């Protein structure tokens, strides 16, 4: 039985990855995340079905021990894009160091271990035309989140022989439990991906290791997940209403998480066949879960008016 390690396992994507791995019934699963009330609650229901380790991916001793004993690593542990305003040293300490620990441990102790690394499509910067993985990368001023992703990609390519890098756009998650990315320019035309499709693709990668090895792909939801960012934001505010996270992003965050469309995203869909959801199906699920937020929806109306005005320019 193949052994799979998931870092950042208590997040939205991590829990879905666990769900899909369990449904396959052929993997021994280890979930790694920091110990706190939130992660404990998220992973508690899996206690008897998987191995749960509470610890920090920044801990080299812990990572050495785990990497030695696993065939695949799905490395989801990362800071959130909204934290890109933090000092560079802090972001690097939190984000890059964990990836560096994993790469070093694979190199020294388990070179055959296959790393599945989710990067970001924000590495392309603000491009008007459809982009591909061969396009030149770009770092926005002070966006340390993106800078670390680019540096981690380079580290993986230089040091490892068994890996795949997925550049992932904004993930449409359950926003009652996970942050949405609010700092994207309203008129950016972009491809999204739903959390279910993204997690399923990460799991299906294991079955297609030889086909994707040492490659980089844009992992998106395709044409049915393509829209202007403002259209998606407007619908989220109409369904979910106003939130403190949205207000915080509006006040403090620079609009430096850019959206793109992709000329080559079909390549990975042809291998994994993971795309099953659309933006509209995501909205339908969101509506079913958020029927009670009447006051929040009322408070969101001025912001929706402003977004509509910007979209119709």
Question: What is each model feature region?
Answer:
Residues 279-313:
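Amphipathic terminal alpha-helices
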Residues 205-271, 283, 298-299, 311-313:
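Mid/C-terminal beta-alpha module of Rossmann-like enzyme folds, strongest
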């Amino acid at each position: 039985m193949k052994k799979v390690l998931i870092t950042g396992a208590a997040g939205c994507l991590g829990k879905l990855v666990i769900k899909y791995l369990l449904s396959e019934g052929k993997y021994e699963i280890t979930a790694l995340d920091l110990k706190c009330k939130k992660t404990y609650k998220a992973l508690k229901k899996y206690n008897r079905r998987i191995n749960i380790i509470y610890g920090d991916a920044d801990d080299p001793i812990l990572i050495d021990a785990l990497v030695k004993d696993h065939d695949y690593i799905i490395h989801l542990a990362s800071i959130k894009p909204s934290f890109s305003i933090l000092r560079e040293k802090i972001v690097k300490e939190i984000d890059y160091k964990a990836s560096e620990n994993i790469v070093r441990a694979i190199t020294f102790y388990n070179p055959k271990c296959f790393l599945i690394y989710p990067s970001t499509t924000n590495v392309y910067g603000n491009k008007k035309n459809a982009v591909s993985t061969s396009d030149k990368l770009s770092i926005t001023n002070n966006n340390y989140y993106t800078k670390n992703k680019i540096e981690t990609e380079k580290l993986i390519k230089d040091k490892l022989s068994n890996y795949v890098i997925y550049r992932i756009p904004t993930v449409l998650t359950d926003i009652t439990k996970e942050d949405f990315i609010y700092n994207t320019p309203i008129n950016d035309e972009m491809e999204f991906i739903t959390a279910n499709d993204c997690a399923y693709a990460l799991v299906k990668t294991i079955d297609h290791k030889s086909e994707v090895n040492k490659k980089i792909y844009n992992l998106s939801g395709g044409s049915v997940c393509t829209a202007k960012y403002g259209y998606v934001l407007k619908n989220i505010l109409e369904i979910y209403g106003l939130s403190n996270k949205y207000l915080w992003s509006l006040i403090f965050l620079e609009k430096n998480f850019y959206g793109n469309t992709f000329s080559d995203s079909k390549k990975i869909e042809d291998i994994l066949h993971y795309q099953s959801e659309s933006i509209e199906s995501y909205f339908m699920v969101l509506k079913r879960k958020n029927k009670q937020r009447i006051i929040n929806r009322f408070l969101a109306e001025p912001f929706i008016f402003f977004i509509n005005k910007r979209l119709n320019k």
